[in-house]
């Protein structure tokens, strides 16, 4: 539980300063550290090496575990349905850790912490004023600001007229180095149809194949 809170604090507060963290770890590498006394949190008297190792991993923006975070914004429930379809297929393909979050209901600090932990990320948004849904946009801004990398990304969303949600997520992905977009983004008009389900499941299958291929 406390490790999770460490991840949440690091990813949301320290995440932008990866270069400084890496530099500090190198400077301290020759010292025998007996205590870690952070300005926020518990004092560490043991497991020092584990704490330093975690910070080193986080500073490199390396995922800790195999798994996928699916986060979406939905006005009428259609984008939420798409998220569930992808999540179920990921489970069916053998990915056990699949976390699905509604960006309108879960505080983004918790979502960011989970994204820091897992290699797979799938983001979905309905179109809103020719752009990304307002509850998803701040999350994209945070991840862009932190320079997220070393992740596989799937993209999906819904539209009725000119779209904009999927287009906005694609622009976000194009602005980041070290993010690999998996499969073709899926944009659906209204509620997902049978053919749309197949395309969504394809995102899940391709993402699962990438993750499984990296198993030791």
Feature roles, as predicted:
Residues 1-43, 85-101, 111-216:
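FMN-binding flavodoxin-like domain, especially the glycine-rich phosphate-binding loop
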Residues 77, 107, 162:
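Flexible, glycine-rich phosphate/dinucleotide-binding loops
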Residues 35-64:
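Short N-terminal or domain-adjacent regulatory/targeting segments
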Residues 53, 100-106:
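Short gly/ser/thr-rich secondary-structure transition/capping motifs
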């Amino acid at each position: 539980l406390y490790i999770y809170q460490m991840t949440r604090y690091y990813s949301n507060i320290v995440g932008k300063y990866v270069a400084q963290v890496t530099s500090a770890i190198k400077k301290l590498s020759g010292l025998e550290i007996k205590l870690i006394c952070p300005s926020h949190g518990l004092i560490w008297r043991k497991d020092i090496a584990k704490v330093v190792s975690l910070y080193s991993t986080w500073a490199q923006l390396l995922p800790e575990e195999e798994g996928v975070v699916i986060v979406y914004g939905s006005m009428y429930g259609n984008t939420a349905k798409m998220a569930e379809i992808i999540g179920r297929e990921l489970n069916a393909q053998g990915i056990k850790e699949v976390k699905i979050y509604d960006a309108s209901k879960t505080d983004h600090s918790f979502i960011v912490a989970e994204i820091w932990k897992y290699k797979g990320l799938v983001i979905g948004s309905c179109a809103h004023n020719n752009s990304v849904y307002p509850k998803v946009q701040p999350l994209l801004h945070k991840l862009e600001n932190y320079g997220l990398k070393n992740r596989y990304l799937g993209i999906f969303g819904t539209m009725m007229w000119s779209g904009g949600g999927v287009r906005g997520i694609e622009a976000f992905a194009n602005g980041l180095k070290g993010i690999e977009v998996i499969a073709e983004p899926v944009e659906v008009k209204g509620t997902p149809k049978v053919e749309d389900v197949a395309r969504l499941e394809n995102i899940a299958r391709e993402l699962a194949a990438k993750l499984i291929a990296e198993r030791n």
